[in-house]
Curated annotation (Swiss-Prot):
UniProt-annotated binding residues for Mo-molybdopterin: K67, S68, R92, T210, S211, R238, N240, S271, R272, C273, Y317
Name under which the protein is recorded: Mitochondrial amidoxime-reducing component 1
Gene Ontology molecular function, alphabetical: molybdenum ion binding; molybdopterin cofactor binding; nitrate reductase activity; nitrite reductase activity; oxidoreductase activity, acting on other nitrogenous compounds as donors; pyridoxal phosphate binding
Effect of C246S: No effect on binding of the molybdenum cofactor; no significant effect on catalytic efficiency toward benzamidoxime; no significant effect on affinity for benzamidoxime
Cross-referenced PROSITE patterns: MOSC
Limits of the MOSC domain: 187-335
Record note on cofactor: Binds 1 Mo-molybdopterin (Mo-MPT) cofactor per subunit.
Membrane association type: Single-pass type II membrane protein; Lipid-anchor
Subunit structure: Component of a complex composed of cytochrome b5, NADH-cytochrome b5 reductase and MTARC1.
Catalysed transformations (reactions): N(omega)-hydroxy-L-arginine + 2 Fe(II)-[cytochrome b5] + 2 H(+) = L-arginine + 2 Fe(III)-[cytochrome b5] + H2O
Stretches for region MOSC N-terminal region: 93-183
Key words, A-Z: Lipoprotein, Membrane, Metal-binding, Mitochondrion, Mitochondrion outer membrane, Molybdenum, Myristate, Oxidoreductase, Signal-anchor, Transmembrane, Transmembrane helix
Gene: MTARC1
Species name: Homo sapiens (Human)
Length: 337
């Protein structure tokens, strides 16, 4: 029970002894119930882990700072309502836009997957092969313009990262003029509920397609690769959390997960598009695989056709129930079943 609990019990015992008999008994009874409830709540996380079945282990954690650009593998990350965070790097908090403010992704510019954004202290570094690195401050100057952007039809703001950054990206892609914007904490997030009503009105994202968390299992990836001539990587599908040690497509049935103190709730499957055909190592889009193979065996149930259309499903979208930090190697437990 601990020193605090013992002290409280002693005070209530003295109080009970100074009261009439029936009041003393009642006071002692209420005290025992209250302290018992406190002890039970404190012991519940440990007891719950003993009762739960482990369904896997965290094998990889990925943050994609710039939408459609190279992912950053991390050994641990904070789980926030808007996705993974590691220091100053947050998932999909930077976005490439065109002159009209529309998002630009690897669907239009496949070579975006070759650009990386890393952070060292207060300095961000944009890097790409055969191109000089560009350094920029983690805090975008407040004198920079704020743009109204559009991501999958929903408006969201972003602060311009400057002319040098715009020229660097445009030069590397050899494209029309593009700009890089940054989502800041005071800006209004997008609501995935406006995209798919399976999400809750309170769920929020910055520049992610639909959800703050995407989970995929190594077993599902291995099953897909067994059907392909040219193997693909997890980064073709841009998951945030990759799970090992589970059955093939087990993630399809995980309603709620517990990882450390973090609780995640499954919302829906991730429907796949042509972006999966971009090779993350070369920036070349094949337009066929692995999408064609996925279409042959990962279609939705006919009753869900209105939600997913004819797009194949691979990986699952989750939202946050309880925040905390997760690490590679953490056991993954199933909740609510």
């Amino acid at each position: 029970m601990g020193a605090a609990g013992s002290s409280a019990l002693a005070r209530f015992v003295l109080l009970a002894q100074s009261r009439p008999g029936w009041l003393g008994v009642a006071a002692l009874g209420l005290t025992a119930v209250a302290l018992g409830a406190v002890a039970w709540r404190r012991a519940w996380p440990t007891r719950r882990r003993r009762l739960l079945q482990q369904v896997g282990t965290v094998a990889q954690l990925w943050i994609y700072p710039v939408k459609s650009c190279k992912g950053v593998p991390v050994s641990e990350a904070e789980c926030t309502a808007m996705g993974l965070r590691s220091g100053n790097l947050r998932d999909r908090f930077w976005l490439v836009i065109n002159q009209e403010g529309n998002m630009v992704t690897a669907r239009q510019e496949p070579r975006l997957v070759l650009i990386s954004l890393t952070c060292d202290g207060d300095t961000l570094t944009l890097s790409a092969a055969y191109t000089k690195d560009l350094l920029l401050p983690i805090k975008t100057p407040t004198t920079n313009a704020v743009h109204k952007c559009r991501v999958h039809g929903l408006e969201i703001e972003g602060r311009d990262c400057g002319e040098a950054t715009a020229q660097w990206i445009t030069s590397f892609l050899k494209s029309q003029p593009y700009r890089l914007v940054h989502f800041e904490p005071h800006m209004r997030p997008r609501r995935p509920h406006q995209i798919a009503d399976l999400f809750r009105p309170k769920d929020q994202i910055a520049y992610s397609d639909t959800s703050p968390f995407l989970i995929l299992s190594e077993a599902s990836l291995a099953d897909l690769n067994s059907r392909l001539e040219k193997k693909v990587k997890a980064t073709n599908f841009r998951p945030n959390i990759v799970i090992s040690g589970c059955d093939v497509y087990a993630e399809d049935s995980w309603d709620e997960l517990l990882i450390g103190d973090v609780e995640l709730k499954r919302v829906m499957a991730c429907s796949r598009c042509i972006l999966t055909t971009v090779d993350p190592d070369t920036g070349v889009m094949s337009r066929k695989e692995p999408l064609e193979t996925l279409k042959s065996y990962r279609q939705c149930d006919p009753s869900e056709r209105k939600l997913y259309g004819k797009s194949p499903l691979f990986g699952q979208y989750f939202v946050l129930e309880n925040p905390g930090t997760i690490k590679v190697g953490d056991p993954v437990y199933l909740l609510g079943q």
